[in-house]
Amino acid sequence: MGSLSIWHWLIVGAVVLLVFGGKGKISDIMGDVAKGIKSFKRGLSEDEEKAEAKPVGEPSLRSLDHQGAGDPLKTPDARKIG
């Protein structure tokens, strides 16, 4: 239990290479994450601007003419027949 196996050393080596190896790989990764977050926020603000641009009024519904609506048996034409 006190000794480390080969898998432990491989994981430690990979972490060390990731942190200290190359030309700022961590900073590149964090820069990409920051760009993604900024792009996401920009997309959200554009969606909010589009939603605010739409007028919030009554929905455009076609109106129906209800002047002749009623009991069809009580119309003047129906009384003449019966």
Swiss-Prot record:
It is found in: Cell inner membrane. Keywords: Cell inner membrane, Cell membrane, Membrane, Protein transport, Translocation, Transmembrane, Transmembrane helix, Transport. The keyword Transmembrane helix applies. InterPro entries: TatA/B/E, TatA/E. GO terms for biological process: protein transport by the Tat complex. One of its GO terms (molecular function) is protein transmembrane transporter activity. Its main location: membrane. The Tat system comprises two distinct complexes: a TatABC complex, containing multiple copies of TatA, TatB and TatC subunits, and a separate TatA complex, containing only TatA subunits. Substrates initially bind to the TatABC complex, which probably triggers association of the separate TatA complex to form the active translocon. Belongs to the TatA/E family. This is Sec-independent protein translocase protein TatA. It comes from Methylocella silvestris (strain DSM 15510 / CIP 108128 / LMG 27833 / NCIMB 13906 / BL2).
